[in-house]
Curated annotation (Swiss-Prot):
The chain crosses the membrane at residues 257-277, 278-298, 317-337, 344-364, 445-465, 497-517. GO terms for molecular function: protein-cysteine S-palmitoyltransferase activity. This is Palmitoyltransferase akr1. The active site is at 430 (s-palmitoyl cysteine intermediate). It catalyses: L-cysteinyl-[protein] + hexadecanoyl-CoA = S-hexadecanoyl-L-cysteinyl-[protein] + CoA. ANK repeats lie at residues 1-29, 33-62, 67-96, 100-129, 133-162, 166-196. Palmitoyltransferase specific for casein kinase 1. One of its GO terms (biological process) is protein targeting to membrane. It comes from Schizosaccharomyces pombe (strain 972 / ATCC 24843). The keyword NADP does not apply. The lineage of its organism: Eukaryota, Fungi, Dikarya, Ascomycota, Taphrinomycotina. It is found in: Early endosome membrane; Golgi apparatus membrane. It is an enzyme of class 2 (transferase). Its main location: membrane. Keywords: Acyltransferase, ANK repeat, Endosome, Golgi apparatus, Lipoprotein, Membrane, Palmitate, Repeat, Transferase, Transmembrane, Transmembrane helix.
Amino acid sequence: MGSLFLAASQGELDTVKNLISSEKIDVNATDEGGATALHWAALNQQIPICKFLLEHGADVNAIGGDLQAAPIHWAAKRGSVKTVHYLVQHGADPLLKDKQGFNCLHLAVHAASPLLVVYLLHLDISVDLRDDQQHTPLMWASYHGNEPITNCLLRWGADVLATDEDKMTPLHWSIVGGNLKCMKLILKEGGIPCTAVTANLSGQLKTPWALASELRVSHLFKQALISNGLKVKETSEEPEKWVVVPSKFQFSQKTFIIFCFLSSFIITGVFFFIMSICPMVISLIIAPLWIYFTFKYITTCIHANIDIVHFYLETPFLAGIFSSIFFWVWCHSLLYIVPKTLPIKPLSSLLFVLISFTCIGLYVRTAFQNPGYVDKIGAVVQRREEISKLLDKDLFNQSHYCLKCFQVKPPRSYHCGACKRCINRYDHHCPWTGNCVGARNHRTFLLFVFTLSTLIPIYFYVAFYYLQNIPIQKKYESYRCLFISGTICQWSLKDMFVLVASLTLFVNWCWVVVLAFTQICQVAHNVTTAEFRLFKRYGTLVPPTKQNSSPKNGHGIHGSFLRTVCGILGLDQCILLIRESNCFVRCFPSRAELGSQNSTSLSRNLSTVNPYDEGSIIKNCKTFWKQNFLNDGRQDEATRHV
């Protein structure tokens, strides 16, 4: 009889058929521990075996094993969504409890399987089901420090103030687990009232702060409190002298975001003022100090009051820097440069004004236009049907389903951590516009980049004639330049603002040209920035099943300072494209890749793994400029071949 259970666990279908069909062994026979063959098949995800056993009368809800569990419990312990789905379709009861008092939802949390948790929740299972000790799934998830599952349960409406037998709340359990992210998530959903919840542990009343202090994680708990507008206050009330109360000054995240954007105008305005008015020696000292201390103050203020992980991506600071530089230079040009150059160079001056207005319009449209948000499905029944379709195609994984949005991810879409939404044909999140670049605004973004890369050289041209035709300011006629001489010295005495602005714009123009070059190459091969990064890392345009968001380090936010700068300016993407050379199709590996047997880029050709390539650069460009990416049925077909 033991051969039946071994064959069922190892997927030996022919052996199982012979043993059952010959009627030598009952299909519901149990081993020494009371488990049936269906238990072992479910545990090891042997769905063909499960199908055969159920067709021959196996009890889908048979109780067995040391923990008196059903086959669906064994499958849930392994986090096998497909097996659980198959058993549910054939009558398995997901609400059954084992000897420990756990049902499938509890076991899915223990198995750290967010996909299984989402699947079970869509079966109309209560998110707050309790075990025999009155623990909810949220308590277990926060105890294990599983942020994705904690987030899923909270998004589904889990009770953050539920208590177990010891009056422990999910917040208490997150403190026991010592996970900062789970603490933040629970506090964000109102996981603690102004008068702190107390837990009765061995006859002692413990508030969350007392428990955090006892477990030596008070520093983490304090960070979580600050990021949610709370603080610890001393009091004489029982059971302890410390309570958690709201901060005296509370500002919404929207207020801080506006502050972050508008402060950039002050920073750059004062910078230009210092560089234009003060002597060069003094300005070269004061201006960098001004930028450093103001930036440090803003970042400290933001991090101390709102929960921000990636400052550059989740705040419009860089968008404010870009907008403010453009604003101050543009205003100076309209007030001083254009009136002087219009009689001398009327065509260039008018062209500068026209293109500058066009550039402003394209920038505003790129920044505020819907990048292509994936429409959310509100009804649970519809979402359940979508999950079932994915399971039938064996596509229910984090590449095709977003755990944060609870929805199917269309082809070429990714979840943006900064925008908190899934984006159709996601290219990248641009910190300089404060918005994602996706299906709806990618063309607008590209037009803006082209326009800006054209506008800056025109500014240099009209600024040159402006400086050539204005006299030295009277207050500077007796001045002498210390570090510069000749024409540059004369220009600095005429209008230092133009020189500083020109140098600033030249630095920006360099990376804008690099960005334009990179985008042209990618459009020519019908590939997005996100897809190219995936190709570089994995040799495919589709992320591994464990990936459910936009590719990590998409802007070089993690790592060294140089990598951060390169990522923000887009230089890293250009370097990758240059290394791919040969029209950016053939990959040439680095020395490290040559020594790695697992490298995916060795002798890899982008065109062979790119299902979206039309076969020629002209066709790819036509597709980009004419095609409606939101209603393209061909992309579904292309995804099947990846």
